[in-house]
Amino acid sequence: MAPNRYNRFVHFNRLHDWNLTSAQARDLQNRLALDVCRLGNVAEPRFIAGIDVSTPFRARGMGTAAVVVLEYPGLELVETQTVRGNIDFPYVPGLLTFREAPLILQAFEKITHTPDLFIVDGQGIAHPRRLGIAAHLGLFFDTPTIGCAKSRLCGTYIEPASEAGNFTELLDNGESIGAVLRTKNNVKPLFISVGNKISIEDAIFWIMRCCRGYRLPEPTRFAHQAAGKFNTGANLQQT
């Protein structure tokens, strides 16, 4: 029997509790990083999810997580789910997951389409302990996941050529941890890295396939808009 792609209860791995100290969180990252799969090719997906979190300055201690689902290849938006709530974990560089992931997982529990690929606004393995938010969530989802960050967290690189599609390696102490990808002519590049169950080559391919004339790929662009609109009080249609 074919899998139900309209399952009202989309499940994920519940790997651990979120009530941790900063030291415990770092130890957990070091352990979970060993489980990330950096290989894999994504078959033609039907649904691609985008994930982003907005934490407005004026709403300290609050955040909004958005999970959107787009149907490929047209990249039509078919579902938007948002959750607003408290962010309990303090801001600590490298521990973004522990601030944002609990809200993301609450939003994910509401979706009715089963994604074949996730694109997360944030780092995958391009992280000091090789477990940024995209890699961490990729283990929860057990599905191909890509980290698509707007800025660099660690590593060094040579600026890619100015035309869309060009990229260079992101290196950290000689290890290749991602790619610096130009997604639009003459605009700042994005920092792409493996989240889980995908190769960096395939990650670059799918990011470019999801771009439609903007710097951000459509899944995270829609997720960014959804989280921002929710915070400003705009009405969002949830399908």
What does each model-found stretch correspond to?
Residues 35-44:
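A short acidic-Thr-Gly-centered motif at the start of a beta-strand
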Residues 9-36, 101, 106-107, 150-151, ...:
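C-terminal binding/interaction regions
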Residues 58, 126-129, 153-157:
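Short, well-ordered, mixed-charge alpha-helical segments that flank or form enzyme active sites
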Residues 57-114:
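A glycine-rich, hydrophobic loop/mini-helix early in the fold
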Residues 105-135, 141-143:
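Catalytic-site beta-strand/loop segments enriched in glycine and acidic/polar residues
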Residues 144-149:
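Short hydrophobic alpha-helical runs that function as membrane-insertion/retention elements
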Residues 46-56:
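Two-metal-ion RNase H-like nuclease active-site motif
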